[in-house]
Swiss-Prot record:
Keywords: Fatty acid biosynthesis, Fatty acid metabolism, Flavoprotein, FMN, Lipid biosynthesis, Lipid metabolism, NADP, Oxidoreductase, Oxylipin biosynthesis. The active site is at Y182. Its cofactor is FMN. The gene is OPR5. Putative oxophytodienoate reductase that may be involved in the biosynthesis or metabolism of oxylipin signaling molecules. It comes from Oryza sativa subsp. japonica. This is Putative 12-oxophytodienoate reductase 5.
Length: 374
């Protein structure tokens, strides 16, 4: 048995004066799984999340829509109707029975959508009418419609109400999705925002919408229940900024205005390949130093890198995506330095309620049963 005290990822973490009190620092990263039929969370999600829940752990849900215009992928969950809230309740209860904290990620895709996903076949909404350039994947996103200034308060209110609904469903807090090229980032980054009004142009103006969402959600449920995910360095869905350091720093300044803000969850720059090995860029340190609360790092971490960044104080917590997807008992495997199941890309976004979802084996089930990587 490995001495847990020697493994930084498995050391406890207690937020000073806050609600995060963890037995380890291995978090489940938010990952879209496309298995919430008709946007309604399903009973099989309770098994998926509880498989990955441990006493003193922290899980973040898959991205969860705040309204009927927030959709851009098949069968993703929502939290904007009474039906959604009631469907989430038993899932949240099941995670809590395992002793874990559960955070709901609130999401609006903006232009990462097609007319088919939108009410009455209308155009997706965004900061601008700039269409995402086709990337060869076969997906062609529809040309978006630029939001009018007088429409923006309604979108802000959608986030506020979704946050209230998430708390009613029993979640311990929410994570505002301000990353990965979705609506908030479409406003924040200069490549996707060509507005000339108070929501475009300067850095402050481009961040205005995101700040209004943060302020509204904090006002509704309290800063101690609100986290955010940001990815200033990423170039995802044609969403890139000419000065990511300034963008990240400005947003951290805004978060610091809310005393007791739950956490700041940031995505590393794209991994580089050095001498044939993946190498994380480690670009988040200035933001980590500037942010006054709990900091979470994400982006391609493994056991070795995760331990390293906890040990040297680069971050408080590390979120794991694909490794946790394929290894429901990931903290235990890290503890024992056990072999990991390989994830199967082919089943990331399929709608099967079992295959590639809840059928990845636990260590004590079958030591040798690994799912082939695609």
């Amino acid at each position: 048995m490995v001495n847990q005290a020697a493994m930084p990822l498995l050391t406890p973490y207690k937020q000073a004066g806050g609600k995060i009190d963890l037995s380890h620092r291995v978090l489940l990263s938010p990952m879209t799984r496309c298995r919430s039929y008709g946007n309604v969370p399903q009973p099989h999600a309770a098994l998926y999340y509880t498989q990955r829940a441990t006493s003193g752990g922290l899980l973040i849900t898959e991205a969860t829509g705040v309204s009927d215009t927030a959709q851009g992928y098949p069968e993703t969950p929502g939290v904007w109707t009474r039906e959604h809230v009631e469907a989430w309740k038993p899932i949240v209860d099941a995670v809590h029975r395992k002793g874990a904290l559960f955070i709901c990620q609130l999401w609006h895709v903006g232009r990462v959508s097609t007319n088919d996903y939108q009410p009455n076949g209308q155009a997706p909404i965004s900061s601008s009418d700039i269409q995402i350039t086709p990337d060869g994947s076969g997906i062609v996103y529809s040309k978006p419609r630029r939001l009018r200034v007088d429409e923006i308060p309604q979108i802000v209110d959608d986030f506020r109400l979704a946050a209230r609904n998430a708390i009613e469903a029993g979640f311990d807090g929410v994570e505002i999705h301000g990353a990965n090229g979705y609506l908030l980032e479409q406003f924040m980054k200069d490549s996707s925002n060509d507005r000339t009004d108070e929501y475009g142009g300067s850095l402050e103006n481009r961040c205005r919408f995101a700040v209004e969402v943060i302020d509204a959600v904090v006002g509704e449920i309290g800063a101690h229940r609100v986290g955010i995910r940001l990815s200033p360095f990423l170039d995802f869905m044609d969403c890139v900024d000419s000065d990511p350091e300034a963008l990240g720093s400005y947003m951290v300044e805004q978060l610091n205005k809310h005393e007791g803000f739950l956490y700041c969850h940031m995505v590393e720059p794209r991994m580089a390949i050095v001498d044939g090995r993946r190498q994380i860029q480690h670009g988040l340190l200035p933001f980590r130093k500037a942010f006054k609360g709990t900091f979470i790092a994400a982006g391609g971490y493994d056991r070795e890198e995760g331990n390293k960044v906890i040990e040297n104080g680069y971050t408080d917590l590390v979120s794991f995506g694909r490794l946790f997807l394929a290894n429901p008992d990931l903290p235990k495997r890290f503890e024992l330095d056990a072999p990991l199941n390989k994830y199967d890309r082919n089943t990331f976004y399929t709608q099967d309620p079992i295959v590639g979802y809840t059928d990845y084996p636990f260590l004590d089930e079958d030591q040798n049963n690994s799912v082939a990587d695609a």
